[in-house]
Amino acid sequence: MPIDTPYEDLLRLVTERGTPKSDRTGTGTRSLFGHQMRYDLSAGFPLITTKKVHTKSVIYELLWFLRGDSNVRWLQEHGVTIWDEWASETGDLGPIYGVQWRSWPTPSGEHIDQISSALELLKSDPDSRRNIVSAWNVGEIPQMALPPCHAFFQFYVADGKLSCQLYQRSADLFLGVPFNIASYALLTHMMAAQAGLDVGEFIWTGGDCHIYDNHTEQVALQLSREPRPYPELVLAPRDSIFDYTYEDIAIVNYDPHPAIKAPVAV
């Protein structure tokens, strides 16, 4: 059976048809605006196989978001350094993803736990078209070390299956997007487990989809490789989505090609 490769197809599309553009980092990109990828989560866990993805970082970053944390110290304690380039001397990143997900400030001084609210809505009104979690808090963007790239996501239930669609305003296709796909697929599995649902699709929608000019050789190497079957995800049962630990999450039968290193544009 052929392996669906929407990510690799997007890499190829941007390589062939992308527009050369300058960018904030001064690196330069090849860019395409507006694209969608769909993954059937019942058919396997969408962890890219044409290069090895550091799954430990994916899992710990998501758990860090769910903690409502925005300081890299907890990540560093678990050997994860993916946010270090943007952190202050004290490790702080400002009110980024986790803070907005778990503690969105209101004008009255109260805070909204968007993850808990989304989970409650999945249980009480699964057909709601308002089940959205946003990290794009316009009033607090100046305080953030980096404005949210994956800005907001929506849940959708049909036939007892939970799907999630993410909008990513800025998509570093080679380094960032494989992490983002795996992270939100994992979140969808966790939310489905807590709501008593099966998994449906993860849908990724990108705005500025770009390949940095200093990643072109790495992308060419990746596209020369034959995709392999996706792994499976096994979650231990937990009473709350906030109770999951790294040891509760197992990705089995992951057989990727070797990792490919590339510089991060900061």
Curated annotation (Swiss-Prot):
This is Thymidylate synthase. It is found in: Cytoplasm. Catalyzes the reductive methylation of 2'-deoxyuridine-5'-monophosphate (dUMP) to 2'-deoxythymidine-5'-monophosphate (dTMP) while utilizing 5,10-methylenetetrahydrofolate (mTHF) as the methyl donor and reductant in the reaction, yielding dihydrofolate (DHF) as a by-product. This enzymatic reaction provides an intracellular de novo source of dTMP, an essential precursor for DNA biosynthesis. It comes from Mycolicibacterium smegmatis (strain ATCC 700084 / mc(2)155). (6R)-5,10-methylene-5,6,7,8-tetrahydrofolate binds at H54, D172, A265. The active site is at C149. PANTHER family: THYMIDYLATE SYNTHASE, THYMIDYLATE SYNTHASE 1. Belongs to the thymidylate synthase family. Bacterial-type ThyA subfamily. Gene3D superfamilies: Thymidylate synthase/dCMP hydroxymethylase domain. Keywords: Cytoplasm, Methyltransferase, Nucleotide biosynthesis, Transferase. InterPro entries: Thymidate_synth/dCMP_Mease, Thymidate_synth/dCMP_Mease_dom, Thymidate_synth/dCMP_Mease_sf, Thymidylate_synthase, Thymidylate_synthase_AS. Pathway: Pyrimidine metabolism; dTTP biosynthesis. It comes from the Bacteria. Its main location: cytoplasm.
